[in-house]
Amino acid sequence: MRMSRRETMQFSATALAGLSLASLEAEPLAAQGAPQPDGLVETKLRQISTLPLNPDGSAVEYTPQEAGAITGVLWRTKNKTPEGEYDVRKMKIKVDGRGTATLSGTLTFDVLEKLPRHSYVVRLQCGAPNPRGTVKWTGVRFSDFAQAVGAQSFANYCRLVGSDAYFIDEDMTTLMHPQVVLAWQLNDAPIPPEHGAPLRLIVPFRYGARSLKAITEIQFTATSFAPPKPWPT
């Protein structure tokens, strides 16, 4: 993987921004529901786990022999795996180009199956100690998918929504990195439901909250997205 100095600086900046924000987006702010202080007060810092990265901000890659299991599971539906279609060959994912891609509609596996397949052994690490694990992901690069649906240069951002209504908004510079994949295999087997079947976004140089599980919708935009829906209760 080779990147120009300019690309490296741009990517490293966006990666670090995502690392610092991941813990905030992964759970409601601790201050919500508490009385609002009249001024700024000292608060306790969260202990964040270490995420192994290369000097250029990309994820450290491991050998196939180092692949193992993921310990721990996290869902927004009271930590219960949402019901849904877990078979990647039967999946139907909504794609909305919002005027920034030439194709919109329903993404099915036959579209992904025609794209080059890639595998990476990388660390999945939550901001907390768990979930975590060094595992092998197999799928297609997000950049190849974006090209397949005709995402234009002015498609600056992407929103991905999971089956538990959790979502991430990500800049396209990050998603076009060659390590970012739409994966349907974990350690050479279909991703199990608890870890994000049928299709999961893998952003290995960000904390695990950014690797969205069980994708149900993908949107592109040039500017901004509508306000999110409330979390399921």
Where are these regions (language model features)?
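Structured, non-membrane catalytic/scaffold regions adjacent to prosthetic-group chemistry
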Residues: 29-233
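N-terminal secretory signal peptides and thylakoid transit peptides that target proteins
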Residues: 1-19
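Cleavable N-terminal signal peptides
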Residues: 18, 28-29
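Basic (Lys/Arg-enriched) interaction patch that binds polyanionic ligands
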Residues: 24
